[in-house]
């Protein structure tokens, strides 16, 4: 009996030690599934040095054997409260800003990156000195790749290069490298590269991009992409209608929803793999017009949250958000983007086709918007 008691106590002690080793994954949560129409372009913050999001992620590696001629498809998001966030004054609105970096990769069976796409979107939500949200719900934000020269970093760049040019240079640089080689990229205290092989084409802060590349490779899955397929990456970023003004009863929430889609197309324009995710960046604001969320606060994406997103109990089919997203991604594989654009939806962008609603009943308007 004493021996049995000792064994039980030892087991409890081990469980306690294990519980202290939890990890937090830093990946961005994508939008609330609403379709958006791009409006005003956000103001650029050239070569800004953001506090790097610590890469504490521990993605589940897909050990599925890679069929001959295929590649793994990976996607990762890194979303943080920007240091450009600022309080409101009597003379000017405040800015609740989240920066979401997202990366897509194709990886071969040896873990070597065969293709890489990098992008970032700055979601800037204005609020006044009373903590009232000023930016309208569903206001859309273009990514830096889409903005191109309108992002306006070139004049501040020591090499005269725009953000998208530097991001594309870095993406090309990591092709042919493994995740360990990417982790080995030397950065200074401001997150900027120091290797001359990189600084000839990229001198901006890349700390969060490197984290995104690492996580995208680690997250890569066998989804059907083949050697020779074309990798695509798009986002749909909007002000969520869940945003609310502050009041005497509590802080308000400036919420941006960013939905991201990475997919591959074969030579005929047919989708061969699809990876979807979404992050909800919720920045707290006070009734005094101040930003209550700390700079650098990171947000997990819905895929990372898994059951913690807690949609299952509200789902008519008892399915969590990530389960429905994967079902929809599998459904569109084998179709063209034009086919996807023609999917029947109700007025709230919920699918109506029984072939979809058996596994996905949530709004998919944002998914369709990023597959184009």
Where are these regions (language model features)?
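Intrinsically disordered, low-complexity regions enriched in polar/acidic and amide residues
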Residues: 22, 46-49, 165
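Bacterial lipoprotein signal-peptidase II cleavage site
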Residues: 18-37
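Ser/Thr-rich, Proline-interspersed low-complexity disordered segments
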Residues: 31-64
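Generic cytosolic/nucleocytoplasmic N-terminal low-complexity/intrinsically disordered segments
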Residues: 1-2, 54, 143, 301
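Sec-dependent N-terminal signal peptides of Gram-positive bacterial secreted proteins and lipoproteins
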Residues: 2-24
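Intrinsically disordered, low-complexity segments enriched in polar/charged small residues
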Residues: 7-8, 43, 47, 51, ...
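Active-site- and interface-proximal helix/loop "cap" or "latch" segments in soluble metabolic
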Residues: 63-372
């Amino acid at each position: 009996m004493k021996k049995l008691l000792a064994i039980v106590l030892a087991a409890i002690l081990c469980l306690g030690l294990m519980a202290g080793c939890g990890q937090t994954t830093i990946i961005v949560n994508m939008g609330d599934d609403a379709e958006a129409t791009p409006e005003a372009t956000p103001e650029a913050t050239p070569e800004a040095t953001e506090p790097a999001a610590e890469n504490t992620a521990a993605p589940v590696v897909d050990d599925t054997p890679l069929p001959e001629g295929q590649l793994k498809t990976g996607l990762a998001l890194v979303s943080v409260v920007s240091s450009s966030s600022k309080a409101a004054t009597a003379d000017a609105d405040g800015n609740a800003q989240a920066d979401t970096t997202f990366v897509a990769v194709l990886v071969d069976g040896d873990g070597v990156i065969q293709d890489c796409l990098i992008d970032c979107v700055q979601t800037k939500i204005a609020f006044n000195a009373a903590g009232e949200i000023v930016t309208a719900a569903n206001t859309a934000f273009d990514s830096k790749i889409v903005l191109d020269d309108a992002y306006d970093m070139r004049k501040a760049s020591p090499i005269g290069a725009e953000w998208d040019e530097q991001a594309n240079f870095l993406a090309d640089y990591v092709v042919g490298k493994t995740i360990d080689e990417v982790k080995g990229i030397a950065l200074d205290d401001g997150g900027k590269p120091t290797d001359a092989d990189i600084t000839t084409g990229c001198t901006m802060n890349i700390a969060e991009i490197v984290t995104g590349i690492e996580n995208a490779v680690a997250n890569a899955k066998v989804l059907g992409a083949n050697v020779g397929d074309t990798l695509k990456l798009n986002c749909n970023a909007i002000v969520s209608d869940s945003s609310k003004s502050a009041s005497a009863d509590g802080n308000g929430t400036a919420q941006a929803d960013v939905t991201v889609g990475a997919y591959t197309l074969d030579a005929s324009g047919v989708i061969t793999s699809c990876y979807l995710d979404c992050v909800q960046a919720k920045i707290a604001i006070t009734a005094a017009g101040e930003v209550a969320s700390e700079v650098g606060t990171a947000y997990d994406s819905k895929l990372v949250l898994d059951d913690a997103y807690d949609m299952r109990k509200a789902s008519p089919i008892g399915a969590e958000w990530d389960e429905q997203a994967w079902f929809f991604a599998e459904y569109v594989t084998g179709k063209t983007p034009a086919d996807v654009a023609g999917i029947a939806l109700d007025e709230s962008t919920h699918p109506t086709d029984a072939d979809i609603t058996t596994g996905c009943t949530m709004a998919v308007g944002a998914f369709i918007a990023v597959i184009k």
